[in-house]
């Protein structure tokens, strides 16, 4: 694996119509060194009946790593939905599980710089040891 910048296939590349193992195998066969994983794709793997240990075993079987976790949105909202709060925590768990030190986040809303800066500070505080 490239030490500094592993070649990573985006989680979106294979969509959501394949199993976790099919995703990892396809990425390996295509020459990628790592996969990006969305919180939704991780939950899909759990819904397949996989546990964290199973997911890690599949990654090891194909000599692959999760190198990117995504995607936190609506983090600057004053009143975030339960689903967004849970997804954020899921992303934090995934970072710990896979040893990933960053999360892709998006901001689709239009806020003032001051509001955005404050909400980013709060997000970083929630991320705690993952930052």
Question: What is each stretch, according to the model?
Answer:
Residues 43-46, 75-79:
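Short active-site-adjacent helix-start/loop capping segments
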Residues 36-60, 107-111:
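Glycine-rich, proline-tolerant flexible connector loops at the mouths of alpha/beta enzymes
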Residues 5-11, 35-37, 66-71, 103-105:
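Hydrophobic faces of well-ordered beta-strands that scaffold small-molecule active sites
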């Amino acid at each position: 694996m490239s030490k500094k910048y592993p070649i990573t296939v985006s989680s979106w590349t294979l969509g959501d119509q394949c199993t976790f193992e099919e995703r990892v195998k396809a990425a390996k066969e295509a020459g990628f060194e790592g996969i990006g994983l969305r919180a939704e794709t991780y939950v899909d793997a759990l819904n397949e009946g996989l546990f964290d240990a199973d997911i890690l075993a599949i990654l090891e079987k194909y000599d692959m790593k999760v190198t990117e976790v995504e995607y936190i949105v609506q983090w600057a909202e004053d009143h975030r939905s339960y689903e967004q709060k849970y997804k954020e925590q899921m992303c934090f768990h995934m970072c710990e599980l896979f040893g990933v030190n960053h999360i892709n986040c998006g901001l689709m809303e239009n806020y003032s710089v001051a509001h955005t800066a404050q909400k980013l500070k709060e997000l970083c505080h929630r991320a705690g040891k993952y930052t």
